[in-house]
Design a protein with these regions (language model features):
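N-terminal secretory signal peptides that target proteins for export/translocation
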Residues: 1-15
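Sec-dependent N-terminal signal peptides
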Residues: 12-24
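N-terminal signal peptide c-region/cleavage motif recognized by signal peptidases
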Residues: 30-32
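Early extracytoplasmic/domain-onset interaction patches
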Residues: 39-64
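Long, contiguous binding/interaction regions
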Residues: 65, 89
């Protein structure tokens, strides 16, 4: 765990933000009001902005869970305990510990040119086991196809502190064609502030410049 920590020394304290995994609520009998004020689950999150021939298709997320939480979830879904998720096991895990996140926008907040992107969907969900820990991968479509300048901000957080999320300071751009030049940074975004505007999450900020 802490795969991004060494690259993020000196960053703002808000690099670690809250994410509550309500998709796993079958295993945690709590509500947000009952959650403790310090994290119990830790997630490293990396984002890849994916382009196709039309423009910015969307953002692929990859979450690595801490070993203790992963062991608990895999204990229920990796039925034969072989550290490989079969298609049936992966489907059961999706239904039992992921789909409920739809009710919470998958804890993903996106601003496009300062405006809220409200249609947060998740496709291509793929759980796996890497180096003994649980990994989620999924895709959030955006479909920005015009050739205007755009600024896209993506943050992963929730107003509960049950789970801490460490964002990758070196997120990626994939499949870029000659339509755009891009700049990608991880930085605090004050417009996303929450908890009485006292907490400012870090977001991956992608600037698209038409060529």
């Amino acid at each position: 765990m802490q795969r991004f920590f060494a690259h993020n020394t000196g960053k703002h304290e808000t690099a670690i933000q809250a994410l509550i995994l309500l998709g796993a609520m079958l295993f945690f009998l709590f509500s947000p009001a009952k959650a403790s004020a310090h994290p119990h689950v830790f997630v490293d999150c990396s984002l890849t902005f994916e382009f196709n021939d039309n423009g910015l298709a969307g953002v692929r997320q990859k979450w690595w869970f801490d070993e203790m939480f992963a062991a608990m979830i895999l204990g229920d879904f990796d039925k034969n305990h072989d550290n490989i998720l079969t298609p049936d096991e992966a489907k059961a895990l999706e239904q039992g510990a992921f789909v409920n996140l739809k009710n919470f926008n998958y804890f993903t907040r996106i601003l496009v040119d300062g405006q809220e992107h409200k249609q947060i969907e998740a496709t291509e969900f793929n759980p796996s086991i890497e180096e003994g820990t649980l990994v989620y991968e999924f895709f959030v479509p955006l479909n920005i196809v015009d050739q205007d300048k755009h600024v896209v901000m993506v943050a992963i957080y929730d107003e509960s502190f049950y789970t801490a999320v460490q964002m990758d300071p070196q997120n990626k751009v994939l499949g870029l064609s000659g339509k755009y030049k891009t700049n990608l940074e991880l930085e605090p975004v004050s417009k996303m502030a929450y908890f009485y505007d006292q907490i400012v999450p870090e977001a991956a900020v992608l600037t698209l410049l038409p060529q």
